[in-house]
């Protein structure tokens, strides 16, 4: 089925941005709480890579999962980035303002026969490396059953090189799935490079499957190191002590925090003090390309 003109226009605009050779990156936090040092370390790495390339760095707020959003979190994210000297280009992009775009793509996928309803619960699929195709051949039904709606899955060919299995593109609670929204946004915004934490590497196979379904090339992906607590666990937004507010209350200023984040990326010794611009200049003078080992 042909892609509707208004969706083609979105894709073509993104393709033009990517074709002009300009680096286009983004930082895409969720407003589910205050950013912790791991989030900020990824933001710094993404910003450094974009600025070294003389490119564009966008701020996208992934706020589709509204029950998990915290009041004031969007403003707090912007304030934290400003305080650290991480400037973005243009206005912040809210995914919640783009629901119509995602819904249009869902409608096109469904009308083209690429989707099927699935009633498997997370508990039923726990521990499986890939979706086994339980509901693929029909029978699950698109409507309400036992007071529940189905999730919608994208049919992924068994020969798909990433072996992701059929990808959820709309959750059973009606929310657009992360895997679809982020792919649509990277394409429509002309993103050339995605810098994110190592914990999101596992999302790559499913996202590549969505790109293939759209017959589009994915951006380049770079996965940065994670920050862990004293027990070796990944930092969580639930831990207030891992955020900027706790560090500022201890008397740390922006150069001290940038130095702390830089050391976590391997770009300086612990205890260094420098601004984001100074770090950018230092790496450039030394010929070190941020995000490239």
UniProtKB/Swiss-Prot annotation:
Q: Does the keyword Aminoacyl-tRNA synthetase apply?
A: yes
Tell me the enzyme class.
ligase
**Segments carrying motif 'KMSKS' region:** 234-238
Cofactor(s) listed: Zn(2+)
In chain numbering, motif 'HIGH' region lies across 29-39
Q: Which GO terms describe its cellular component?
A: cytosol
Q: Which GO terms describe its biological process?
A: glutamyl-tRNA aminoacylation; tRNA modification
Q: Where does Zn(2+) bind?
A: 118, 120, 131, 135
Supply the InterPro entries for this chain: aa-tRNA-synth_I_CS, Glu-Q_tRNA(Asp)_Synthase, Glu/Gln-tRNA-synth, Glu/Gln-tRNA-synth_Ib_cat-dom, GluQ/Sye, Rossmann-like_a/b/a_fold
- In the UniProt record, the signal sequence range is none
Residues that bind L-glutamate: 26-30, 62, 178, 196
Q: Which residues hold ATP?
A: 237
Which note does the record give on the cofactor?
Binds 1 zinc ion per subunit.
Query: What's this chain's function?
Result: Catalyzes the tRNA-independent activation of glutamate in presence of ATP and the subsequent transfer of glutamate onto a tRNA(Asp). Glutamate is transferred on the 2-amino-5-(4,5-dihydroxy-2-cyclopenten-1-yl) moiety of the queuosine in the wobble position of the QUC anticodon.
Task: List the PANTHER family hit by this protein, alphabetically.
Answer: GLUTAMATE--TRNA LIGASE (PTHR43311), GLUTAMYL-Q TRNA(ASP) SYNTHETASE (PTHR43311:SF1)
User: Hey, which family's this protein in?
Assistant: Belongs to the class-I aminoacyl-tRNA synthetase family. GluQ subfamily.
Protein's recorded name: Glutamyl-Q tRNA(Asp) synthetase
Species source reads Parasynechococcus marenigrum (strain WH8102)
Q: What lineage is on file? A: Bacteria, Bacillati, Cyanobacteriota, Cyanophyceae, Synechococcales
